[in-house]
């Protein structure tokens, strides 16, 4: 074992738990409905509307008014959409895009860069990508019966995700 490299523990492998796509329009109505169509075209799933938590008079937002849409994508579809989003960013993110718990996010300014055909009836929308990472065995902290904590050595850190991101996508982190 000393001459050959030690085998990696399969329980330590990082994987994508979910990818959340969010478009915040800042107002309810027709623009929000068109943004929902964009997310439905991209993900193939029905998006969910999010409400404002409190009134902001300067922006003209009232409490409980629907102001954004988001969709959660899991599995191979999440990896494929993330790949398309990173291609727009040219596989380059900043160190501050990665959280302390190992998740990362970024935004794009035009959805047509993802390969969706431009429709004048819909318009152009920017969107946020947020990717949550996980390891096998993390269910122990979420399950209902015999719940326990994930140990400190098994928790995902920013450095773990940056290393995974660089190797998986051959990307640059500034």
Curated annotation (Swiss-Prot):
Q: Which UniProt keywords apply?
A: Cytoplasm, Ribonucleoprotein, Ribosomal protein, RNA-binding, rRNA-binding
Q: Which GO terms describe its biological process?
A: translation
Q: Which SUPFAM superfamilies match?
A: RL5-like
What is the top-level taxon of the source organism?
Eukaryota
Q: Which residues form the signal peptide?
A: none
Q: Which GO terms describe its cellular component?
A: cytosolic large ribosomal subunit
Subunit structure as annotated in this protein's UniProt entry: Component of the large ribosomal subunit (LSU). Mature N.crassa ribosomes consist of a small (40S) and a large (60S) subunit. The 40S small subunit contains 1 molecule of ribosomal RNA (18S rRNA) and at least 32 different proteins. The large 60S subunit contains 3 rRNA molecules (26S, 5.8S and 5S rRNA) and at least 42 different proteins.
Q: Which family does it belong to?
A: Belongs to the universal ribosomal protein uL5 family.
Q: What does this protein do?
A: Component of the ribosome, a large ribonucleoprotein complex responsible for the synthesis of proteins in the cell. The small ribosomal subunit (SSU) binds messenger RNAs (mRNAs) and translates the encoded message by selecting cognate aminoacyl-transfer RNA (tRNA) molecules. The large subunit (LSU) contains the ribosomal catalytic site termed the peptidyl transferase center (PTC), which catalyzes the formation of peptide bonds, thereby polymerizing the amino acids delivered by tRNAs into a polypeptide chain.
Query: What protein name applies here?
Result: Large ribosomal subunit protein uL5
Q: Which organism is it from?
A: Neurospora crassa (strain ATCC 24698 / 74-OR23-1A / CBS 708.71 / DSM 1257 / FGSC 987)
Q: Per UniProt, what is the name of the gene that codes for the protein in this document? A: rpl-11
